Amino acid sequence: MAFFHSRYDHYTPCSGEHNGIAQKIQIVISAREKVVSPIRQWYNEAVTQWYCRPERYGVMNGGAHVAGTFKEKTMEKNGYTDTIRKGLLGVRALGSSMSRGKGSAEEQMKRLRAALEGADAVVIGAGAGLSTSAGLTYSGERFERIFFDFAAKYGIRDMYSGGFYPFPDDETRWAWWARHIYFNRYIDPPRPVYRQLLELVKGRNCFVITTNVDHQFQRAGFDKAQLFYTQGDYGLFQSVNPAIQETFDNEAWTMQAMAAQGFVRDETGLFRVPEDGRLSMQIPTDLVPSCPTDGSGVVMNLRADDSFVEDAGWRRASAAYADFLRAHEAGRVLYLELGVGANTPVIIKYPFWQMTSENPEAIYACINYSEAFCPQAIEGQSLCFNRDIGDVINEICI
């Protein structure tokens, strides 16, 4: 499970008869949240320095050399490290005084429409709040419907904490992950927010950077060549062997693992819980996934530490993002930030602030329910919408 996901900002306490381990996990998560604010600035600087250190690109996992020499890696264009450097610069340069933006809600909406219409380029930065707006929630009714049996047996109360749970065996652990993957990666979200966003920017010169790993931009029809998923993809496995710097598609495995648990397909072909509610919480041993290259174990391709595999596709997307930013350092650029939380601001939020401050023609627009703000230093170039993302997108289109 990737610690650096902005999706996982809110948790619900675990409860139930057999929830001792789950409660301990929740206590650790809650304790972490209590100390995040005071160490936020330190954390962002430390993470940035860690990502930008040269050895990250040549040595991983205790000194095991991976594909590509240090010289080869550092010669590659890397939008990820570029944007993190900009983020750190923004934190240092723009100060701590924040604003909710200038003007009434109506005035800001008028300015946003004008900025979108007149933009030479649009850079979309998307975090967990966008998928939440689309209905891909990790707790509540949706969780209870999909993971009711895991909740009853293990006391797990949301998908986030379930990703940390020390399940008793691989068969149970991968049964959990098959459900998590399927219902967040291989189905369309309940609300068409991503498709509405696509309609909003269709025909425009646009690029997307996102910390989300649910593949929803591509499902909605966004051009893969204009997408950079920085933190991985629920649809990919990677080997536990650090010498294998490849990723492996898991769609066929996921479908088999869902059927093996007793999920049934409805008239549209989507998996549903059977009417009798009888599901297995394990998959057969021969379905436990393994690396097709050497037979070793696999893990999710989600960024948690320096073992995360940045495969050829990731590097192409990173280079494309770097090229797009460099091609639009000046001119009328709209930096449209959607649902970016406080877990990974150095990847999207802070770089957007810094790039806006460097370009007097740029506009920074932040749409984020309860978390829309900007530095006072760029207040005149900023638009802040403290509302549901889907609602704002609908209003822009009116």
Question: Which role fits each region the language model picked out?
Answer:
Residues 10-11, 18-21, 33, 43, ...:
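Short terminal hydrophobic/aromatic SLiMs and anchors at protein ends
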Residues 50-398:
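Conserved catalytic alpha/beta core of Sir2/sirtuin-type deacylases, generalized to analogous enzyme cores
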Residues 5-7:
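Polybasic, low-complexity intrinsically disordered segments
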Residues 38-44, 49:
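N-terminal targeting/docking segments
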Residues 2, 12-13, 22, 31, ...:
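Ala/Thr-enriched low-complexity intrinsically disordered regions
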